[in-house]
A protein has these predicted regions:
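N-terminal accessory/pre-domain segments preceding catalytic cores
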Residues: 2-190, 306-382
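Sterically constrained small-residue positions within well-ordered secondary structures
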Residues: 104, 148, 221, 254-256, ...
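Secondary-structure boundary elements
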Residues: 165-222
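Catalytic cysteine-centered active-site loop
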Residues: 210-217, 227, 248-258
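Hydrophobic/aromatic-rich core segments of domains that either
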Residues: 232-305
Length: 382
């Protein structure tokens, strides 16, 4: 998909920058004859693997749920990690979620799931993927339906692995080193907002958006290649926030007509949307010189705000996000709702004195924006 370009004030002042969308995943469905059932192949592009560490604040959260279930073939018990998507499922879908997660983590070839409904299986699989941005060794799945006459009596689920267990373990060890180096900078005193802002800034500021990079639908491209697309950004955001004890899930859909992925996160007990891809200035303004600018317009936004550009595909039942306390501009005191030259002057004057290359401020309306721009220009702040 093509990059979208938006331009606001040049040079020192950056105001309310908007970004563009990227490719998420493609789906393939094939039917072939089989006895006594049918085989259908589906491919979704998303990734995950789960590894919990004791990073500051990780143990304080209560939303993550785990279930220990023994596998039928006697392999070691797999601790099933549940996230936001799991909580939106029916009891039947939740049971299949556990079965899908278990076989993926064990990297077994197949499992007979406890449903005969292909839509239930698809919902469970996509929910596992949405909850687990760390799974990078699966690109989709095959399923085999077994029938008696016209009645489906059972379904086998077979993950489509992109690598063997040895290669997976190798990549995971490399990812662990990078992730540890990122999260070691998190301060024990930080709350949800500070942790989420750190993850957002790290990914938006250090990972380049590039369509053609290898493994761009998973976290390998993010942590090892430092180049990715929206799916990689969203998966990495979910993974890092989960390790920090912040509930997060990957949301898929479209943004300005292009397939896209972003995140739903819970900060201080309230839900917000976050789009790390659109936080990367090089994605939108790579040709205008703002290579180090971070766009905060999609950090901690409401449903009403994100719906102007993003449309979820219905995979997840999403809440109506109305909280604004942890929106970047509100939290940082950079959301201007009424004209006050002293406030605006102080924000940009401080940034100028601190040699901040760009400063982002959001205004309630165009009239306030124009007032601020004129005021700053005539006061020779820029």
């Amino acid at each position: 998909m093509k990059k979208k370009k938006r331009h606001t004030l040049l040079k020192f002042l950056i105001l309310a920058v908007m970004a563009g969308g990227v490719v998420l995943y493609s789906g393939v469905l094939q039917d072939t004859g089989g006895f006594p059932g049918q085989i259908r192949n589906q491919v979704y592009v998303e990734q995950k693997n789960a590894k919990a560490e004791n990073y500051p604040g990780a143990a304080e959260k209560k939303t993550e749920k785990r279930t220990e279930i023994s596998t039928e073939n006697g392999t070691p018990e797999i601790e099933v990690t549940h996230g936001y998507a799991y909580e939106t499922l029916t009891a039947e879908q939740q049971a299949v979620y556990d079965e899908v997660y278990r076989v993926i983590m064990a990297q077994d070839s197949k499992v007979k799931v406890s449903t005969c409904k292909e839509k239930v299986l698809e919902k469970a699989y996509r929910s596992v993927i949405a909850d687990h941005g760390e799974i990078f060794w699966v690109s989709g799945y095959n399923y085999t339906q077994y029938t008696m006459g016209k009645k489906i009596v059972s379904i086998d689920f077979s993950p489509s692995y992109t690598m063997g267990r040895t290669e997976r373990d190798y990549y995971q060890s490399q990812i662990d080193v990078v992730v540890d180096s990122i999260l070691k900078n998190v301060e024990p005193s930080w709350g949800d907002y500070e942790k989420a802002k750190y993850v957002f800034e790290y990914l938006a500021g250090n990972i380049e958006y590039e369509m053609g990079t290898e493994q761009n639908q998973n976290i390998i491209s993010v942590f090892l290649n430092k180049k990715t697309v929206c799916q990689g950004y969203a998966n990495a955001t979910q993974y890092l926030l989960t390790l920090l004890g912040i509930p997060a899930v990957v949301v898929t859909g479209t943004a300005e007509g292009d397939t896209h992925a972003w995140n739903l996160v819970q900060l201080d007990g309230a839900y917000y949307f976050m789009d790390t891809t659109w936080g990367n200035s090089s994605y939108n303004n790579g040709e205008s010189g703002f290579s180090s600018f971070i766009n905060y317009n999609y950090f901690g936004v409401t449903t009403a705000e994100i719906s102007k550009t993003h449309q979820a595909d219905g995979t997840l039942l999403l809440p109506d996000c109305t909280a604004t306390a942890d929106n970047y501009y509100v939290r940082e005191g950079k959301y201007i709702t009424e004209w006050n030259p002293d406030v605006v002057g102080q924000i940009y004057g401080t940034a100028y004195q601190n040699v901040v290359v760009t400063e982002a401020v959001r205004f309630l309306n165009t009239s306030l924006y124009d007032q601020a721009k004129g005021y700053l220009i005539f006061c020779l702040i820029i």
